[in-house]
């Protein structure tokens, strides 16, 4: 998969392109900031040390120092800004000292990476990502590019995510010129400008599609693909219509236009085995697996369909495999015909990629605080019920093997396991190692924090949202203008929950009350089962649900919740709630030039922070009593948030009237909700006191538990299982060299932006350095294992696992006969025969009712095997011996009491 393959590249910031005098000022600024940080730390330490008089003197001195440092920072920053402003547009050269390991970042496999032939075992210099801090420097880079190591680099594009984080992607100009037609299917900027231009930020986003993480679609055949018009219809319903001029809100019935295939197309069942997202030059979206060919034949519909250029196609005669829609082909109007695109696709060696394919098994998910905070009338009993799965999981971390290994991502459905995960699967006794125990303790604390901020395990799954494709085919091939489809208003179909009649469909970000409680038609056996044969959430073309969820269908997912308690609460809270509706602005076109692209980027960088709106809405939902003004404020902020999201394209943001601002500020001037201590690691002084809002109550309803890790169902951990030669003598020089390399890498890591990328780079470097010592790899691994697992019993082994984990796994496989496995009840190893349900011969003899959720334990008094609950770590005797023990203790206590009474007498 694309997310499993990545390449190391450099991620710089604008300081990497400073001239010498600018760099001198930058270093002076950095030094002043370090001094400021130290002064603040000293000031905090002084508050709890020294006598009163001496403490006041030292604090006063630190304040004077801070004042001088702040003045230096202001003056130096102003001088640097003036210097940069005088040099706007100058051509710059990357400073060689910027290309150091701390500036390594990783990029996933993509069409861009494949075109530039990036390699996974080196640091690639063909693509460089630049973080923007000063626009004056970025201006020159965008217009002129830069030079490094004798190569010219030019600005390529920025994805939506990179725009949010103020990043620009630069590539080697000579390579880009060579592969441009392959990336763009022959479309040039000159051609775009001839046809009137395009919105600059849309252009950047569409060009950046080739930088999406994808696998190459080897069997993609462009000759078996067509592009047709989207299905559009009118849906009548009640909405809260919001005016973006005067901010009035009116509940009214409206006929709303919907593009029912916005971002989604179809692929035959024999072409893809599940729904998947795809990318091609200027194309993106979701491909829904749907048997449109079988449906045409069964219904006797005409197989003739017209493409977006007016050419008719017989999808059966032409053996069409994939039908895309106009909304997926972003630059369709700049090609003369579909034939031209196909010819260019083949001529220039273009390719398609896919990503995020629907998994064979979808795990249950977690809620988040946004989904919970809009449920404003939840009782404590209901909250306890919702949190019960999470509480049980936290408790089971202490003693249940399955829960323990699942904390490391090891489940029966796990794929692409790393070395440590594979070792746990083969040798679960590894859970008793100090490193693993330390990780479990950290995981338990993290789970508690997650639970306190609303991340609760729920009976629900994330899955793609897809419109009723049967209705789409009725419209496309049956000629029905407004087809009925297989789903009516208020109905959905999700085959993941065939026994659940009602579902709550939610989506992030979840700002207003956006719980779409719908009837699940998968609970009824019908014709729908034949056509809706994937795990997606299918929605009706007569429903306002896509307006509630604020979704399109280009790969958007919904958390579909089937938990009865949650659905009941959501349905109750949605009484009287209707979708919000407002008219969004259109994005204007521009002639594309380097200056226009940079201006568009600056507007996107400075257009607004959507996080501010989300946090403001959280303040309102957690403010206490939810009044009418509170609800109105949430609606206004939701509208503002969506306009800010589109601001980079539309350059339009509504301005709230003063009276509206006053109402909103009455809520948003407060501090953040208390649970942000756990959700965003905020300090206590920056949040409100804990009140009785839904999410805030979780802290008191889920108390912290001090759990002692126990391993009652496993044999003792033996470090020799991880070794090839347990009798090896340790060379201290090997240990010293390894520790020196780890310490050096850790020091580099403290200044790195992308910690994971830097570590993976150093894992390879550490391994090569160790192998250069002259010992065989197996001997080096044995020495390290013996030292860190046996002699030192270290709690820090992440580098060892990521450097030599594959060798350790091979040793485990060699030392443990693969014909043996551990019994999931008693932990004993036994020989695997046929289907034994994971039980050894002794446990298979136990009664059926004891096989689920029970394990076998030996009574410490009589030695008899007894079945106890998996989570029970206290029982040590069978019931008969425990009763006898209680009698014995009672008799001893009675005897002691009588003795004390006689002495007192």
Predicted features along the sequence, with ranges:
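Beta-strand-enriched accessory nucleic-acid recognition/scaffold domains that flank the catalytic cores
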Residues: 1-550, 557, 563-905
